[in-house]
Amino acid sequence: MLFATLGSINDGNIKILEDESIKITEDLTIIGRKDKTERNRKNSRELIEQADQNTYLILTDHQPVELIENSRLGYDLQLSGHTHNGQIFPFNLIMKFFNLSEFIYGNKKIGKFNIIVSSGFSGWGYPIRTAGNSEYVVINLKKENTK
């Protein structure tokens, strides 16, 4: 499944952002991070300094980490996954009880900073899911009227 997905990404000419940003419109920039297990992963400050900070800044990070820091730096929205919303019972309870992630699932706001952590549309490791539903997240961004 993973290799089929990676093949589809390559065949579809989809750009994976790894510690880089792309300005989509004059008002929107998306910044993608390398996985936190990568040794040469840039920090959030380096990435935001390289981006146009006069745009709405969306940070994509597989793991929902450094949320307080990202809110202080001025990111507008962080999109993450990784937790699969506790894909397999009882790991969903263990994750919550031992606070194994800064944020496990859903939408959270820190000041003006929004975080969305999705359970994803697939699983990890085992082709089963006994906790947390699969999902696609649809986000509608609307430009504020600044008149």
Regions found by a protein language model. Give the residues of each.
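Soluble catalytic domains of enzymes that build or remodel membrane lipids, polysaccharides, and related
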Residues: 1-147
